[in-house]
């Protein structure tokens, strides 16, 4: 169900949501959080698809703020005045929750916090998500300051390097970036490989992945911090994601390799036959669901962001 509310206000939007809940015989108290999405019109549907998928695991109210909405509202006297258009999605069009899309015009664009406050789920955590371009300092952004968790995605920003530098400079304990979340399966498999005997020291490591790929440099920083060994980064312009990690040990080479475009990896350990294992490239849905599952600060990510330069990301 999709309901358009042109030239409206937050009171009318809240009333419409209450009306729809009453018609369906349900309550909004089952929502575990409010997800604020600060996005563009171009990116809106892609972000909502991911939010819908994530809401099946985390029933939530999604409030999307589209701040590049270009139309204007002109009063009869010919003056441009602030106004708000909105859309409410329920049922099959909204996952396990409801979606509110706000299209502020003119001066309202500068006051997103006043628009979303009346629409928040009471007594529930607030998560702010910027699917592409993030503010320079998310913790002091008008929406970010309201949130108990802030999610960015530096890899999908227009200027990835600048975004990484800003996030590092203005890091806050509640910040997370999906470039780190994409590494969860790789880190789990590598940790599992190192848990197997013999527990000999790692001498060096090498990682292969795309050029200017944030996850590649985060994984290298994690290995360097965890193993205290030199890590070589090899950039492959044709790769779309990380393709291999190689660890050198006295008794031979340990490797985790995933062919470009593949969804299976190969684990090779000294003295053992190579083993195939599922390792698909993580989708945006996967990453967002993981971050909504873990709202608490990630101490390992925090250490990497604080202690490692971002110039090469």
Task: Name each model-derived stretch.
Residues 97-191:
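Internal, hydrophobic cores of structured domains that mediate oligomerization or house catalytic pockets
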Residues 61-71, 129-132, 153-157, 230-241:
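A generic structural motif
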Residues 1-120:
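An N-terminal, globular interaction/scaffold subdomain
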Residues 227-228, 239-241, 250-313:
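Long, compositionally biased intrinsically disordered terminal regions
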Residues 1-31, 177-195, 289-313:
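Short N-terminal or domain-adjacent regulatory/targeting segments
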Residues 157, 161-251:
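A contiguous, surface-oriented mixed alpha/beta subdomain in the mid-to-C-terminal portion of proteins
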Residues 53-64, 120-127, 145-151, 224-234:
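Structural alpha-beta junctions
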